[in-house]
Amino acid sequence: MPPELLRDVLMRIERSEDTWPSRKNVVSCVGVCKNWRQIFKEIVNVPEVSSKFTFPISLKQPGPGGSLVQCYVKRNRSNQTFYLYLGGEAKIFCQSEPSEPNKSIWKLSLKPGGTATTQTELDNFVSFRSPSGQKEGVLVLKSKVPRLEEQSWCLDFNGWRDIVSSGKKFQLVALLRTNLRMKTTFSSLRKSETCTNSSYEAEWIPLVRTSVFAVIARVCRDKKHTPSYELKLALYFAKNSAILKKFVLRGYTREEDLLALPVAN
């Protein structure tokens, strides 16, 4: 095909059907020689200017914000994997994180008041409609590992959950040492939502291995008891404790009442 005829065909396609996603016709062409590639570079603009013709590398950049793309995300509970379906048909499944340049290439190319520089040649481009056996350059979505808050037994998902100090929940941490110890960190017992400061001070309490799991299982299974009962239960299971150097309760229950509890059998 002569270069003049190719230029005329591309310009006609460029002028027709300029709206997404209502456009239905998709044209795919490849510049197999140097002259054809030069014509493509002259006619095809960056995605900010033209949305009809684009290069494969431009597909990795974010799309326009004015239109919607139909998609569906499915979660696999067995291995905590997420599958992305585009248009209800195309399935994207990934098993490794993308390389760092691919994640930030569009951010580095954008400048205030200008347009993005678009790469016109791509060495190896694999369509997502026919996934190959290679595992490079794919993305994995997994649940973020929660962490326990210091003052209460609340999960912190960095924005996914609100952290509020709770008087009915506390944190138990067991250390795998010769002398198995459990650290109890209590939060405020008041019902006021404005009170978030810790109202307890506790030191290390020596516990046996079975007692640690007994306290955790009992508190997790039954949430109907008051905070005072849970606190007494924690001390009740603390058998074989030779020393309780310091256990201060402020404004709720007297220290003498808790230390007078019998030792578990």
UniProtKB/Swiss-Prot annotation:
Residues 228-250 form the FBD domain. GO terms for biological process: regulation of DNA-templated transcription. This is Putative Tubby-like protein 4. GO terms for molecular function: DNA-binding transcription factor activity. It comes from Arabidopsis thaliana (Mouse-ear cress). Belongs to the TUB family. Residues 1-44 form the F-box domain. The gene is TULP4. Transmembrane segments: none annotated.
